[in-house]
Structures are given as structure tokens and as C-alpha cells.
Design a protein with these regions (language model features):
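Extended catalytic cores of very large enzyme megasubunits
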Residues: 1-212
Length: 212
């Protein structure tokens, strides 16, 4: 299959591993890595089947698989494109606490660091103006806390936007840009502000916002 120039550029900038000269090298690298964890008696067949699937785009692997599978030095990256986070997973009885919120923010940072996309329903965060027992003040609300997620995403991916003259061997020219999905349920008191948030230029620009 003859690739268009724009397709070659996308491959070079996003998916080509060091020392790979052509797209078929990328396909072989993925097939070998996928087969490497199989039972020895099945490795060759799995390799051949996977290679056939990839060759000439009979099928195509996800972006993180294509970019990272079988590449030395990228063991800390993910092979999944997107993650949906559940606040209940952190184990706090009162997840809507400063401890719970910042633990969820840490989980977001680790997900983006590994190049995964991030999604979460933020409805569990109490709305702005609610009294915080034991502190004597009121909560800043969902949108204020979402700004922390925004800053975290921008900070983690900022290095990938810096133009440098020297690319270390094995270093990517591009990484994922901190993609996030933020959801708020229709019943939440801040839903109108949530809907209008992106009318302000530069606000929550790392988010795709959806009403649940």
C-alpha cells in the first residue's frame, strides 16, 4: 500500500521507533512484542497472525500500542489510550475531602505521565459555597478544583511542546497532549457554570466537557 506524504509524517512524528526505517518495521516490532508473552508453542503463529493483521492495514492497533509496544526505554508508558477514573477506587469513606481530591489528582498525573487519556465524572465534588465542617470556611466548588486538573495536564505535557535542537536517541518528538474528559451530572448545582466554562478563552482547554 502506497502511503500519502501526510501519513508518512504522522508515522515519523508519532509512532516510529528508533532505528525503524519503514512502516513494516513498526508492524514487525509490534507483532514480535505481542507474541513474546505467549506460550512458546504458540509464539510463531501469534506473531504471523498479528503481523498479517497489521500489514496493509487489515487491522490497526491503538495509538499507544503502535507507539510503545516493544520499544526499549518506554516500559513506563501505557498500552491503553484512555482511562476512566472512579473516585470510589481510592478507598476513602469520605471521598469528597481534600485528601480524596488530591489523591484523584495524583492518579490523573500518573495517567497522563504514562501517556494515557483521562476521564472522570466530577459530580462527587460538592458545589461552590458549601460549608466545610471543622474548617469554618466554604468549598470553592467543582470548577475551581477542575482548574487543578487543568494545570496538572498543562504542566506534565509542557516539556513536549518545547522546541529543542537535539533529540536523544529513543526520545519521542511528540507525546500525547494531556487529553481529558470531564463530566458533570445535570442535577449538580454548578451545571450552568460548567456548561458555560469554555466560553472563556483558555479556560479548561485541556478538557472535553460533557453533561451527564
Amino acid at each position: 500500500m502506497q502511503l500519502q506524504e501526510v501519513s508518512k509524517e504522522v508515522w515519523r512524528d508519532n509512532y516510529k521507533a528508533p532505528k525503524e526505517k519503514k512502516l513494516s518495521d513498526t508492524w514487525e516490532r509490534q507483532a514480535k512484542a505481542a507474541a513474546s508473552v505467549e506460550n512458546p508453542s504458540k509464539k510463531q503463529q501469534i506473531y504471523e497472525d498479528f503481523l498479517w493483521l497489521l500489514t496493509d492495514f487489515h487491522g490497526i492497533a491503538g495509538g499507544r500500542i503502535t507507539a510503545n509496544l516493544g520499544v526499549e526505554g518506554r516500559e513506563a508508558t501505557t498500552l491503553f489510550n484512555c482511562y476512566v477514573h472512579n473516585p470510589a477506587d481510592i478507598g476513602y469513606k469520605d471521598v469528597d475531602s481534600i485528601h480524596g481530591i488530591y489523591d484523584m489528582l495524583k492518579a490523573q498525573a500518573l495517567t497522563l505521565k504514562s501517556e494515557g487519556g483521562y476521564g472522570m465524572n466530577f459530580s462527587w465534588i460538592r458545589p461552590a459555597g458549601m460549608y466545610v465542617a471543622g474548617i469554618g470556611s466554604r468549598t470553592p466548588g467543582v470548577l475551581a478544583f477542575m482548574e487543578l486538573w487543568e494545570i496538572s495536564s498543562k504542566t506534565i505535557t509542557r516539556g513536549s511542546e518545547k522546541i529543542i535542537d537535539y533529540i536523544r536517541e529513543g526520545e519521542k518528538k511528540k507525546i500525547r497532549k494531556g487529553a481529558q474528559m470531564g463530566i458533570l451530572e445535570i442535577w449538580h448545582p454548578e451545571i450552568e457554570d460548567f456548561i458555560e466554562a469554555k466560553l472563556t478563552k483558555g479556560r479548561l482547554e485541556k478538557f472535553n466537557l460533557s453533561v451527564g
